[in-house]
Amino acid sequence: MLKTAAAALMIVLMSVGTAVSQTQDDGPIATASPRSESADSVRLREALAYSNPLPRGAPTQDYPLVAWCDALVTGHADLGDTLTNRNPEDTELVRLGRLEAQDFRSALVAAEPRQSAAVKAEAQRAAAAAKAQWAPLLANTDETSRSQAFGLFFGLPGRCEHAARRIRENITTPPATPAEVGLQDAPAAE
């Protein structure tokens, strides 16, 4: 009995391994959300993104946050453009960064008429602060240092993409909490 179960398990594991191997050989793995993503899936990802803390210096309001995210990803792409010895992966990161920045800018343009002067000023300050972080690296004449810095950029908070969608679509209700999407027990009513 155990030998039969072990043999069956091996067959399953081998077939899963083959399927994974074939899938990985088929090309890049898509990490962006598909166009057909369900509303529940978006709500779940949004709840997770908003439940995680933002990095130090990141604005908490959506509009300034999107401006900050745009400046960070644009700075990273600008740094990548300074490299003369880019490999194909670096070139792809620059391309994807430019697309992400374009998405952030289109969200900012769509939402700009609805923002107060104070929020717009906060967004400008946030973008300037993020851009200033890249300035010393962009000015560095040592390509090895620039290349290392380019490789160390860990990406943006997940909240950036959701904040961009929320300001573009004029969503003013608070994002769902993890408890509201079933990830945590809801707090007890007092």
What residue ranges belong to the model's regions?
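Acidic, low-complexity proline/glycine-rich segments
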Residues: 24-48
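Compact alpha-helical subdomains of small soluble proteins
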Residues: 100-190
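Sec/Tat signal peptide C-region and signal peptidase I cleavage site
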Residues: 17-21
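Positively charged n-region of N-terminal signal peptides that target proteins for export
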Residues: 1-4
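Short linear interaction motifs
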Residues: 47-55
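Short N-proximal segments of mature Sec-exported proteins
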Residues: 55-114
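Bacterial N-terminal signal peptides
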Residues: 6-16
